[in-house]
Amino acid sequence: MDSTNVRSGMKSRKKKPKTTVIDDDDDCMTCSACQSKLVKISDITKVSLDYINTMRGNTLACAACGSSLKLLNDFAS
């Protein structure tokens, strides 16, 4: 018997997979004026959309402070 293939009584262990916990509260976007948390796209089915105030075009109004929120590419035009 070859001694290189036998592990003299040691059991082989499986490595546990590394897990990382992602805190969803930290990556939520906030309003630049009042720092209130905005709805994430993944939460859109869980939230009532009655409070969203749409202005003209792609501009939204923050429900907490009323400031206008628009996409960054709208500032270039």
Swiss-Prot record:
Interacts with capping enzyme RAP94/OPG109, the two large RNA polymerase subunits RPO147/OPG105 and RPO132/OPG151, the two early transcription factor subunits OPG185 and OPG133, one of the capping enzyme subunits OPG113, the nucleoside triphosphate phosphohydrolase OPG123, two core proteins OPG129 and OPG138, and a virion protein OPG064. This is Protein OPG146. It is found in: Virion; Host cytoplasm; Host nucleus. Plays a role in the maturation of immature virions to infectious particles. May also participate in viral transcription. Keywords: Host cytoplasm, Host nucleus, Phosphoprotein, Virion. It comes from the Viruses. One of its GO terms (biological process) is virion assembly. One of its GO terms (cellular component) is host cell cytoplasm. The keyword Phosphoprotein applies. InterPro entries: Poxvirus_A19. Belongs to the orthopoxvirus OPG146 family. Its main location: virion.
